[in-house]
Amino acid sequence: MRRSVHSLAAVAAVAALGLAACSGGTSSSSSADAEQTYGPGALPTVTEGKLTVATSDPAYSPWILNNDPASGEGYESAVIYALAEELGYSADNVQWVRATFESSITPGAKDWDLNIQQFSITDERRNAVNFTSPYYTTSEAIIAKAGTPAADAKSIADLKDVLIGVQAGTTSQQFASDTLEPGLSQKLQMFNSSDDTVLALQTGRVDAIVVDLPTAFNMIATQVDNGVIVGQFADAQDGENYGIVLPKGSKLTPTVSAAVDRLAESGKLDELHEKWLNEAQNVPILK
């Protein structure tokens, strides 16, 4: 479930305090942003006059529809085009590239300005890359096949004997390792990709899988036969924040983060959420 735009804006205000250090600047991000000239050629992008944005390959709904980020369809694609407009770039001046999840949060030179693919903001990742203010807040969820013992769980304790799978290297894996595994009778099963994780559930190699809530809704609609969302593990105030990634030390960080803040404050992020991520049912919280 997502945090309200007002709460996101409050988080953004706190996050902004650290942006100057992240970007190498010494003045406040708000004053720097106020003096910034926007538009093609005005910002220090990797390709002059263009805003280059990376995402995963493939990219999944509801974040990007039909693996086509340039369509503007799906929450993250729509956020990028709203952000580009805020920065003075037309849709024609946005160009997309692909990057793996792990390479995107590894130190080193990048061929993109921004990267969006459900990156949770963590202190560890801040050592390697910069983040904008949050554009979305979610929680982890657990999926199982309907009619199985795993699907009947009403609490975390009920998951004790459930064999759980998760994609390695994700915050879902970190959450499951830290919060769930100590109380499980069996070790977590790790998989290299989202598709491998789903396949493990489909074929019975695991009883349930842990993913973020919007992905869970998409999986039970399009990938997992007879799948159900058993529950989520946090409410709207305790979920994890997603931020757009920039290369470490990027001079764009304060400007882009301030633009994300404006989208939150104006209600645009709420509007896009209602269009692309409006969950159709209430999901119980497992405690």
Each predicted region: which residue ranges?
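Extended ligand-binding regions for polar small-molecule ligands
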Residues: 23, 77, 81-86, 170, ...
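Ligand-binding clefts/hinges and TM-proximal coupling segments of bilobed small-molecule sensing domains
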Residues: 24, 28-34, 171-188, 228-229, ...
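Extracytoplasmic small-molecule ligand-binding "clamshell" domains
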Residues: 32-115
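Acidic, polar ligand-binding/catalytic clefts
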Residues: 93-156
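A ligand-binding cleft/hinge motif common to bilobed small-molecule-binding domains
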Residues: 103, 119-128, 177-178, 202-203, ...
